[in-house]
Amino acid sequence: MLGRTLQEVSAALKQGQITPTELCQKCLSLIKKTKFLNAYITVSEEVALKQAEESEKRYKNGQSLGDLDGIPVAVKDNFSTSGIETTCASNMLKGYIPPYNATVVQKLLDQGALLMGKTNLDEFAMGSGSTDGIFGPVKNPWSYSKQYREKRKQNPHSKNEDSDWLITGGSSGGSAAAVSAFTCYAALGSDTGGSTRNPAAHCGLVGFKPSYGLVSRHGLIPLVNSMDVPGILTRCVDDAAIVLGALAGPDPKDSTTVHDPINKPFMLPSLADVSKLCIGIPKEYLIPELSSEVRSLWSKAADLFESEGAKVLEVSLPHTSYSIVCYHVLCTSEVASNMARFDGLQYGHRCDINVSTEAMYAATRREGFNDVVRGRILSGNFFLLKENYENYFVKAQKVRRLIANDFVNAFNSGVDVLLTPTTLSEAVPYLEFIKEDNRTRSAQDDIFTQAVNMAGLPAVSIPVALSNQGLPIGLQFIGRAFCDQQLLTVAKWFEKQVQFPFIQLQELMDDCSAVLENEKSASVSLKQ
């Protein structure tokens, strides 16, 4: 049961094949067995079991709340959860218990979902590896997969040491690891520059970033208000659509949410015709740093659409080379503004220094924030200085408009969906990842993803195939603003063609027997 999709488990619950309590207990048991992954900061065992008990009563009375009733989910620890600690993986908020739920959390609970816990991340979601939080780095479940370990045994240069584990990507790495290791069926991440799609690609998952304004940000502790979006991590596209159907819609507590009618639920056709589609391939994304394996799979994915009658067209996004610098200026500027609220006076960490308010304020922030967060605050304050404001922040805003217009022009040229890489390569070992600083790594890892956030578009990363090392590689689809359903429909068709294989966790074979029974093989269409 643990290896099935959300949709399959929902059907099993409705048919009485398993109860919510039994399912919850299985997931809690697996969370304990996979504690070494460090995916969870807080495990809400009592809360989840109580929710499972209530769900069980509803099923017995024939009053199921829908597809999410009784389904174990996890939430990134930068979403407020009433009565459950919310830390952002920072000393600044360690011990902070919010008095309210984020809108997306409340919507999941209103649909009967079971909250298994809060997942690990980079401090305040600032990073691309899930390595810079106070609770330690998250380990990629694929580090312990049969596929990866067998490939390592074949490599004469491999040391095959347990210390050579892989990063999950970030900053939603805990959520990605939680879903990948079968401890829940869906998880919330946040996506400011790729923080949901990046770990999805590294962990063999579907990572969906909705259009800006489609899903409420209320209760998501802000990083960059103009780009932050709640993200969804699942094992298949249909599951992401189910969760999106529960989350999408206007929220009076978030003025950026759209109030136009939205087609809900997001039902995806079982058979889609892609022959009339035009798939755009941005030529600026073909960069030297892109690994040969990702480049090859990207090309074969385009050929796959073409073989089905779709038109594949090379397009230009001419301001792409400026996007990562533009993103850095705007991101750090908004970070500096948002982090100003953590002053030790209202909530969160407070230093004991009583010399003056200014001294207490400075010491609190020095103790509460790590070097990465303090560095971004300093950069942002520099860009916002009176003498720098026009040359940096205002110019970056103008470039952002040009970047957004590039996408508009591409779609207006007849393109329906853009196809790009998600990451430069597969996941790398932790010891290799930390050789470079957070800022450098983030700039590299966000190269294909952050422009989508600046343009407010929907995007989804789909696992395509395993690399020669036995690790997941993902590709990204980008859609028009608020054409999320069309985007997911195309992604579902592609997912069916490539048939990405399930992870085989050697330590968890007994628990994941369903995975082995239903194991799929990598598609020959992209690997041959």
Curated annotation (Swiss-Prot):
<dbReference type="GO" id="GO:0005524">
    <property type="term" value="F:ATP binding"/>
</dbReference>
<dbReference type="InterPro" id="IPR000120">
    <property type="entry name" value="Amidase"/>
</dbReference>
<dbReference type="GO" id="GO:0005739">
    <property type="term" value="C:mitochondrion"/>
</dbReference>
<feature type="active site" description="Charge relay system">
    <location>
        <position position="171"/>
    </location>
</feature>
<dbReference type="InterPro" id="IPR023631">
    <property type="entry name" value="Amidase_dom"/>
</dbReference>
<feature type="region of interest" description="Disordered">
    <location>
        <begin position="147"/>
        <end position="166"/>
    </location>
</feature>
<dbReference type="GO" id="GO:0070681">
    <property type="term" value="P:glutaminyl-tRNAGln biosynthesis via transamidation"/>
</dbReference>
<protein>
    <recommendedName>
        <fullName>Glutamyl-tRNA(Gln) amidotransferase subunit A, mitochondrial</fullName>
        <ecNumber>6.3.5.7</ecNumber>
    </recommendedName>
</protein>
<comment type="similarity">
    <text>Belongs to the amidase family. GatA subfamily.</text>
</comment>
<dbReference type="GO" id="GO:0050567">
    <property type="term" value="F:glutaminyl-tRNA synthase (glutamine-hydrolyzing) activity"/>
</dbReference>
<dbReference type="InterPro" id="IPR004412">
    <property type="entry name" value="GatA"/>
</dbReference>
<comment type="function">
    <text>Allows the formation of correctly charged Gln-tRNA(Gln) through the transamidation of misacylated Glu-tRNA(Gln) in the mitochondria. The reaction takes place in the presence of glutamine and ATP through an activated gamma-phospho-Glu-tRNA(Gln).</text>
</comment>
<dbReference type="InterPro" id="IPR036928">
    <property type="entry name" value="AS_sf"/>
</dbReference>
<dbReference type="GO" id="GO:0032543">
    <property type="term" value="P:mitochondrial translation"/>
</dbReference>
<keyword id="KW-0067">ATP-binding</keyword>
<feature type="active site" description="Acyl-ester intermediate">
    <location>
        <position position="195"/>
    </location>
</feature>
<dbReference type="GO" id="GO:0030956">
    <property type="term" value="C:glutamyl-tRNA(Gln) amidotransferase complex"/>
</dbReference>
<keyword id="KW-0496">Mitochondrion</keyword>
<keyword id="KW-0436">Ligase</keyword>
<feature type="active site" description="Charge relay system">
    <location>
        <position position="76"/>
    </location>
</feature>
<keyword id="KW-0547">Nucleotide-binding</keyword>
<dbReference type="Pfam" id="PF01425">
    <property type="entry name" value="Amidase"/>
</dbReference>
<comment type="subunit">
    <text>Subunit of the heterotrimeric GatCAB amidotransferase (AdT) complex, composed of A (QRSL1), B (GATB) and C (GATC) subunits.</text>
</comment>
<keyword id="KW-0648">Protein biosynthesis</keyword>
